[in-house]
Amino acid sequence: MGANMTTITDEKKPRTAPPEVRRKQLIDATITCIAKNCISGTTLAAIAKEAGLSMGLVSFHFKSKDILLSETLKYLTEEHRELWMQDALCDNLSAARKLRSIVDAQFHPRICSRKKLAVWFAFFGEAAHRKSYRATSSQIDMERQKVCASLFSDIIAEGSYMGMDGENVALTLEGLFDGFWLNMLMYPAKFSREESIRQVLAYLEMMFPQHFANQIL
């Protein structure tokens, strides 16, 4: 009877899920596989196994590995964008507060995990997928850079800072973001999310002491 009860229970388990749930499962599995095996070592079979789904379901939701990779990169990019834009476009926040939110979003645990950093740099590092990386992420990177440049220009005007250019400071900030991400991936014992935020805020305080003083943790 115990075996029969187990069979009945198993038969009652749902075997289907909404398409968006299955797609998210497969994208999460792709992120895990790329972090473990890089892009070249990631196969649809490995993704299916990681997700606990059949190859048929993988092929149904994503017709090819390239499509799944493209959708995974798009997911990561949009996830990042949604986070940093939450406060960046709020009219009731100061320019300095918006920039602080952008910095915090860059190193948020949901965005800046070792697993996801490995995936970001895997796309950038493998020549076959670099074009896809640029096509997907460059537009959003430029959007963030323009937002930061505008905010820095506002701060420069507010504080009457001399000899500064908002676009140049925004370019430097983007370089710091990329550099700390890479160092966190390569040297995790020396670089943490918290320390990276402190270093970025130290730079901003040096450039704009009236607006970023006493923000370092």
Residue ranges and their predicted role:
Residues 164-184, 196-203:
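Hydrophobic alpha-helical segments that form the core
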Residues 19-31, 47, 72-76, 80, ...:
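Generic hydrophobic, amphipathic alpha-helix propensity
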Residues 92-94, 127-135, 142-169, 207-217:
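Hydrophobic alpha-helical bundle segments that form small-molecule/ligand-binding pockets
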